[in-house]
From Swiss-Prot:
Superkingdom of origin organism: Bacteria
One term under GO cellular component: cytoplasm
GO-annotated molecular function: nickel cation binding
Protein name: Urease accessory protein UreF
Gene: ureF
Organism, scientific name: Chromohalobacter salexigens (strain ATCC BAA-138 / DSM 3043 / CIP 106854 / NCIMB 13768 / 1H11)
Function: Required for maturation of urease via the functional incorporation of the urease nickel metallocenter.
Record's signal peptide: none
Family the entry assigns: Belongs to the UreF family.
Keyword Cytoplasm listed: yes
Subunit structure as annotated in this protein's UniProt entry: UreD, UreF and UreG form a complex that acts as a GTP-hydrolysis-dependent molecular chaperone, activating the urease apoprotein by helping to assemble the nickel containing metallocenter of UreC. The UreE protein probably delivers the nickel.
Length: 230
């Protein structure tokens, strides 16, 4: 009897998701730290243990309550061609970006991804596209066009976030690649759990609770020396 795991994924859709979450995707995500650079400068994060606590907190009180459930909703809205829902959740998410840098990151990554997808003939002509689409909304569209399921798109988005944050930390901290991979192993189950929890949330349960990240991001706007744009 074979003990080999059986794939439940469309290989082409999986390859499309891997393309979307790749650090090589030319949208400039590497330039943004989402407040982590400021947390490093302030000494809130200074080693592997404190970085793990920071990332776990942002995942639990941020992505799980904000980006991931919104991604689930806009993935469905794209499938249904629901322009009203797309506009609502695009506006809601951008209104919850608590600093100029975080809002700029959302809008710039969204705009860059739209331009890339258009150059690849991957954006259908649709009046449902918001006027200033954010990254989450465009990521959901790209996943939908590639046949990526809602749950897989959410997990891929969370994975890309984690990988980017660890890249930031490795550049700005004396943090080695092995330490980064230990954090990946620690947080991989948390990413899966975050997707499940996000799917169970009602609309009224949504909203980030990250005052520390908001403060770090605000302070980053006037930080003297910076490697990253947020």
């Amino acid at each position: 009897m074979s003990t080999e795991p059986v794939s439940q994924h469309d290989p082409l859709a999986l390859a499309g998701l891997m393309q979307l979450v790749s650090p090589a995707l030319p949208i400039g995500a590497f330039a943004w730290s989402q407040g982590l650079e400021s947390a490093l400068e302030l000494g809130w994060v200074d080693d592997e243990a404190s970085l793990g606590e920071w990332l776990a907190g942002v995942l639990d009180d941020g992505l799980t309550r904000c980006e991931l459930p919104v991604l689930a909703r806009v993935h469905r809205a794209w499938a249904e061609g629901d322009a009203q829902a797309l506009a609502h959740w695009n506006d809601w998410l951008q209104a919850n970006r608590e600093t100029r840098e975080l809002l700029e990151e959302e809008q710039r990554l969204g705009g860059t991804l739209v331009r890339l997808l258009r150059s690849l003939d991957q954006v259908p002509v649709t009046p449902a596209m918001p006027e200033t689409p954010g990254y989450v909304v465009v990521f959901a569209l790209a996943a939908r066009v590639r046949g990526v399921s809602r749950e897989d798109a959410m997990l891929g988005f969370a994975w890309a976030w984690l990988e980017n944050q660890l890249t930031v930390a490795c550049k700005a901290l004396p943090l080695g690649q092995t330490s980064a991979q230990r954090l990946v192993e620690r947080l991989r189950p948390a990413l899966v759990a975050a997707v499940s929890e996000a799917l169970a949330l009602d609309d009224d349960d949504l909203g980030p609770a990250l005052p520390g990240l908001a403060l770090a991001s605000a302070l980053h706007e006037t930080q003297y020396s910076r490697l990253f744009r947020s």
